């Protein structure tokens, strides 16, 4: 309708005016800029779509999709992560759309992604897992077991990793002997998706892993 069209045109005009005003108002006020980015990320982490929209609205005024994209993608994978991987992928897609259309229309796909992240369950299990592995490496860097190496030396055929026995792969020990029992990944039970991952993880932990590849390779095919 004509009325709806007029409303839409006014919305576009308002967004353009906000961008124009902002380029002067916030010109290179770096402290305010990074404080606003921080407010956005903390609002997403704290599941507050209203706070997130407020800080996003302020950031629109900088007309800087790239910096905004970096911060929101970090937030998606750092704070939502395995609790809702699809939301992370939708965030990537939203910013692809945003770059295609540019501001002021870019505000719509980005707002959708931010609200999605705000109201998603949260999990920092991936970040915690890689940080635990990095901490272990800082203490001692260990080589991969011989049977995992690209060209294993001094192993009989039956002692080598068997590419033709996929049913055995989850029984193999992949960590070096010195840290064989380390568990870097600890599931967060905040979503059905990660609960399903955790259930499979428990099943694998229950049957354990072995570095005796020769014995494993001699087990009968199921």
Positions of predicted regions on the chain:
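Extended hydrophobic
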Residues: 15-23
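Short alpha-helical scaffolding segments that buttress acidic/His motifs in well-ordered protein cores
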Residues: 18-19, 39-40, 56, 69-76, ...
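Short, small-residue-biased leader/transition segments that mark boundaries at the very start
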Residues: 1-8
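Short helix-adjacent coil turns
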Residues: 44-51, 60-63, 102-105, 189
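Alpha-helical, coiled-coil/dimerization segments enriched in small aliphatic residues
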Residues: 79-222
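Conserved helicase/translocase motor-coupling segment
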Residues: 22-58
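Short, charge-rich amphipathic alpha-helical segments embedded
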Residues: 58-74, 81-82
């Amino acid at each position: 309708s004509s009325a709806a069209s007029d409303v839409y045109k006014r919305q576009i005009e308002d967004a353009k005016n906000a961008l124009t005003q902002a380029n002067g108002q916030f010109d290179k006020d770096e402290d305010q800029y990074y404080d606003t980015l921080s407010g956005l990320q903390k609002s997403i982490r704290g599941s507050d779509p209203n706070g997130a929209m407020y800080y996003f609205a302020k950031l629109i005024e900088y007309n800087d999709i790239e910096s905004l994209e970096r911060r929101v993608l970090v937030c998606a994978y750092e704070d939502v992560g395995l609790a809702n991987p699809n939301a992370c992928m939708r965030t990537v897609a939203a910013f692809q759309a945003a770059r295609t259309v540019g501001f002021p229309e870019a505000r719509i796909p980005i707002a959708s992604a931010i609200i999605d992240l705000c109201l998603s369950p949260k999990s920092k299990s991936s970040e915690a897992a890689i940080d635990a592995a990095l901490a272990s490496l800082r203490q001692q860097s260990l080589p991969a077991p011989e049977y995992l190496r690209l060209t294993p030396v001094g192993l009989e055929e039956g002692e080598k990793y068997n590419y033709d026995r996929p049913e055995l792969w989850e029984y193999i020990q992949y960590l070096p002997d010195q840290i064989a029992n380390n568990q870097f990944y600890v599931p967060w039970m905040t979503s059905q998706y990660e609960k399903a991952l955790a259930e499979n993880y428990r099943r694998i932990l229950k049957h354990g892993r072995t570095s005796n590849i020769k014995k494993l390779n001699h087990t009968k095919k199921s």
